[in-house]
Amino acid sequence: MHRRTFLKYGSAGLFTLGMGGFLRHAYSQTAPQDESLLRDRVDPCFDNSPRVAPFTVPLAFAPVIDAVGAVQLTEARGEHVFVPGFRTPIWGYEGMFPGPTLVARRNVPVAVTFTNALPPGEDPSGIIIPNNSRQDPVDHPFRDSTTVVHLHGINTDGQLGPGGDGSFSSDGYPEGALALKNPGESRTHQYPNNGTPGQAAPIYQRPATLWYHDHSVHITSVHLYRGLSGFYVLKDVAEEASGLPGSAAADPGRGIEAGPLGFDVPLVVKDVMLAPEEIDGRPPGTLIYNNCSHFGAFGDLMTVNGKQQPFFEVANRKYRFRLLNGSDSRQYLFAFRVAQNLKSGPNEPFRYIGTDQGLLFTGVPEITTFFHANISERHEFVLDFSKYPIGTRIVMVNLLVDQNDERLFPIMEFRVTRVEADHSQADAWPAAAWAHPADVQPAAITRTFRFNRQGGYWSINSMQFDPLRDDAQPLLDTTEDWVLVNESGGWGHPVHIHLGRFKIMKIQGRAPNPGELTGFKDTVWVGPNQTITVRHQFWNFPGRFVFHCHNGSHEDSDMMSQFNVLPNPGTVGTGTLPGGTPS
């Protein structure tokens, strides 16, 4: 197929304006209210990826690394089989997607050394980009294979520079000292997993499901789409003693490390597009990246842990799942249905137990029948298969697409195939074990940030990202209320704030989703005509960090700002500090 023919295919699927962002539901409902308003109205810009029938291939698991002491990871080109019969060139940590799952322990430091072994330049053979996928309003020194690793959700150092460009670097800072600009370069990231090295109790960092990924300026979207991401699961003694499925107390040796035999299961959901035949000399199965004129890269092939719509054989007992929305731009409304009632429902009830920053701080689950998964969010839930006869099939579905769309509606299938004893519980956990003074600290100030579009670019407070400008200067070991405003009627933004965690204080324009008011977060969905107030914690580390829309195409088009955590003279005042728009 020639490029001209491909572009013809691509334009046929262009979207109608907007994306379902009005989540009008309460916990434990049988079905969403006004479900038609939730539909994902952005069709893939290409809809001819090769595929097999849903639930043909088994769920796959990334290798698990015990992250204690020193860990080495190499960013490399590799091949991956999303669909049987097609070998897709990817970029990945250790050349695989998803990258290895790192399992770390709270208050036990780990040093992870990342080495860039990616091909120099653009590596055009590994991806097809039918349009100008990037806008570069400012010059930057990065090549297309430059990388900067971010451990998403970690509380870690902001003073790792200055780099060659004179800026300080924090974990994931898109420009600065930790950039791997040339093949063969290595950088070591120090993760104390507690807040600060040698920190006395109480420890700040909560056990949680985090993830590591590339964060290079203007090319994050393409790099994540190629495969540069992996899980980082942080555990601790209290959680292991909780009796949750896969914990040491309930299921010794049957946690994440046990892979398909474990009862603590990581799932990364990601949509991609693959070339159905040779295009511009590139083989069938090559990744196609089309960000729909900077609105977002949507795929027509649903994958879980890198496999198209897989099945997972389970025992008739409880399982804990840790789900990451690893898509570039697609959001999901997940529900679970018995296979024979796939289209008619009802949705099966389940326990929702955790958000981005760990288990719910209430210490008890929420019973619900669905949850909204925003880009880059993590969700933890427990499915109890003991109530289903052997042979039952349960399907995870996405309610934001047409239920007749076999490509996008069914996500994966759980098959109840065997009997196993269950010594786990999922009704309570010791939330007090992770309490910290920051969690009850009042806000020192309120700032407002408006997420909009200015001069053809995505922007925050009508400004694009500038590493030489601080848009907020919070004081160290304080909290602030940030009002995140989206006045557009057509697009939503998953807003991610680096460094710490936040609590959602107020939601205007929609009802809360499961866990949003009972769990700590680092990413929040700010949909069209919505305003979300979050209380963010700027604890333990001074320095420069960023916050941004986590729709990769928006982020790369400079919907990102920078804050600089300043040393605290010892008093926390009120009023107006530099940066942001005071409220």
Mark where each language-model region is.
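N-terminal, post-signal-peptide metal-ligating segments of extracellular/periplasmic oxidoreductases
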Residues: 3-174, 186, 287-321, 358-362, ...
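Short, hydrophobic/aromatic beta-strand segments
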Residues: 121-131, 226, 330-337, 491-497
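C-terminal substrate/ligand-recognition segments
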Residues: 447-504, 522-544, 548
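Divalent metal-coordination and catalytic microenvironments
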Residues: 73, 112, 149, 214, ...
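Short solvent-exposed strand-capping/beta-turn motif centered on an Asx-Ser/Thr pair
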Residues: 115-119, 324-329, 485-490
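Active/binding-pocket-proximal capping segment
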Residues: 338-359, 488-518, 552-555, 564-569
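Extracellular/periplasmic metallocenter environments
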Residues: 134-242, 363-364, 369-414, 489-490, ...
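Histidine- and aromatic-rich segments of cupredoxin/plastocyanin-like copper-binding domains
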Residues: 156-179, 269, 273-433, 512
